[in-house]
Amino acid sequence: MALSKKKRAAQYKDLDLDVRSEIADLFRLLGDPSRLGIVYACLGEPVSAGDIARMLKISPSLTSHHLRLLKVARLVRSKRKGKQIFYTAADAHVRRILFDMAEHALEHEHEHEESSA
């Protein structure tokens, strides 16, 4: 059963400093456009680091560096298949956060387009 907005707000209102710091660190990680692009690339089917690098037009070594940081933060997970490692979003929470962020940004974009017309 889903919590009401009021109950959910009350539940998270008094998060301690350690939890708030962890959340801030996650947002800092996602504040880098390359890392954010990597996590978005991992939302669908499992994808290799090389494919991510090609999609985002960034170097394979930088892609690997970002993937290591994102794995430590539990935003992506990896699975080895043969000689390759494939990456996916870590869980439904991560997918929901990124979908909601994109919808929020696109909603603002649509509002801006409508007011310009």
Kindly label every feature range from the protein language model.
Residues M1, I58-S61, L75:
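Intrinsic disorder/low-complexity segments
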Residues L69-L70, T88, H112, S116:
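Alpha-helical and His/Cys-centered functional microenvironments
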Residues K71-K81, T88:
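Beta-hairpin "wing" of winged helix-turn-helix
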Residues R54, H65, K71-V72:
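Alpha-helical residues within the helix-turn-helix
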Residues G31, T63-H66, M101:
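Generic structural signal for conserved hydrophobic packing positions in ordered secondary structure
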Residues L17-S61, I85-H93:
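N-terminal helix-turn-helix DNA-binding core of bacterial DNA-binding proteins
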Residues M1-E22, H93-A117:
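Amphipathic alpha-helical dimerization/coiled-coil segments
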